[in-house]
Amino acid sequence: MAVSNRRIDPTDLRRVHVLTAQRFPHEYLDEGLGAIGLFLHDPPKNAGYRSTPANSITFASTGFDGIHFGSLTDGDLIDPMSPVVITIPMAFEAPNYIVGQTLYDFLCLGCRHGYSNLGNLHLNFEATIEHYQSPPDDFYDERSRDILQTMTDELSLTSWPDVPGRFLDLQSRIIPMLRMPANS
């Protein structure tokens, strides 16, 4: 499966967060990309959970249950061209899933309905994959559609045409690259 080599840096993501927070403010709900399940970490660092791969740098979280997104790397910096892993600490049997070959690829996965629902992969894998293949029309937060459209336009995102096939391909190729901490 072909993957775009488009490079999106964390600074691009931060810029879109600030832009969407300004364009779509809310009195009490999450601002910017937080409204679509991307709470950016500043500075990015390994989240430190027993289930977090030792070779990942956490750059965002969904905002609930410690669920977080990390860039696979051997260093201390996010590599935008490296795979992205979601870690679901409460999923004791299978806490990690690859959700993008690159940062751009990851953002494309959720560009139609956000990123929070990825936290359900361990509860109902098939339904979660179907959610991203054929996203529902409704949103919890009425700003989400506009935030997603702004992010898609600003970063030139395109949704995955075959979510089930792409997702399974990523798992088979990249999961073996995860290095778990010694205490897990």
Regions found by a protein language model. Name each.
Residues 1-81, 144-184:
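A surface-exposed partner-binding patch
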Residues 25, 29, 69-70, 98, ...:
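Compositionally biased, intrinsically disordered low-complexity regions enriched in proline and serine
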Residues 82-122:
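Compact, glycine/acidic-enriched structural inserts
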Residues 84, 128-131, 176:
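Short alpha-helical interface elements
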Residues 114-155:
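An amphipathic alpha-helical core segment
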